[in-house]
């Protein structure tokens, strides 16, 4: 079993969260409902959009560490595919637990919101898996003396 690389997990989580964030902020340009995650999370944190964005990136990083520790070596396929499959886990939790807690109903109350969120989480997972999986494979391929 491969050992968890915390640095790669954190870097992958931050990068994946950033890419997902950009995609979701661009949702209206793609005909999907607006998805301002910072404002949405901030609404349950005293209205602070800044705290909402901080929470979003912390959650993305924690989810990346969970991926690296539990799922990265247990899912089939290349890193980006393993990550995309993993992206389904937080998407389902968000749609069935988080969205109703925020008053939006399951799947954000509409097909567009649920679909947009699905795309965001799949991209998050693919980026995470690509970063974590690729570097893991590269690290495994290096001879031990290359670290000198």
Task: Give the positions of each predicted feature.
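Juxtamembrane/disordered regions of integral membrane proteins
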Residues: 1-148
């Amino acid at each position: 079993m491969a050992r968890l690389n915390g640095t790669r997990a954190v870097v992958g989580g931050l990068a994946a969260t950033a890419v997902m964030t950009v995609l979701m902020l661009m949702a209206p340009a793609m005909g999907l409902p607006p998805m301002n995650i910072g404002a949405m999370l901030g609404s349950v944190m005293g209205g602070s959009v800044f705290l909402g964005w901080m929470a979003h990136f912390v959650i993305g990083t924690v989810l990346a560490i969970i991926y690296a520790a539990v799922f990265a070596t247990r899912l089939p396929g290349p890193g980006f595919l393993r990550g995309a499959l993993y992206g389904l886990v937080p998407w389902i939790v968000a749609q069935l637990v988080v969205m109703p807690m925020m008053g939006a109903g399951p799947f954000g109350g509409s097909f567009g919101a649920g679909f947009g969120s699905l795309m965001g989480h799949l991209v998050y997972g693919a980026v995470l898996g690509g970063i974590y999986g690729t570097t893991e494979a590269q690290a495994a391929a290096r001879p031990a003396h290359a670290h000198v």
